[in-house]
Amino acid sequence: MAVPARHTSKAKKNKRRTHYKLTAPSVQFDETTGDYSRSHRVSLKGYYKGRKIAKANEAK
C-alpha cells in the first residue's frame, strides 16, 4: 500500500480544504406573488414567470 513519505501539516491540510465551501442558492423576487423563489423553478404558490402553472398546496 502507498504511504505518504511526509506528514501532512495542519496548515497544508487546511489550505487544501479552503476550496470545500457551500454556495448560496440563487433566488429571485417574484413580483406576482411578492415572494422569493429559486431561479427556473415554480414558486410555492404555483407561479412561474408570472403565470399560474400549478395548484398550490393549501395548508389545512
UniProtKB/Swiss-Prot annotation:
One Pfam family cited in the UniProt record for this chain: Ribosomal_L32p
Lineage of the organism: Bacteria, Bacillati, Bacillota, Bacilli, Lactobacillales
Ribosomal protein is among the record's keywords: yes
Family of this protein: Belongs to the bacterial ribosomal protein bL32 family.
One GO CC term on file: large ribosomal subunit
Organism: Streptococcus pyogenes serotype M1
HAMAP family: Ribosomal_bL32
Domain of life: Bacteria
GO molecular function ontology, one term from the record: structural constituent of ribosome
Alphabetical UniProt keywords: Ribonucleoprotein, Ribosomal protein
Region of interest (Disordered), residue spans: 1-22
Biased composition (Basic residues): 7-20
Official protein name in the record: Large ribosomal subunit protein bL32
Family annotation (NCBIfam families): rpmF_bact (TIGR01031)
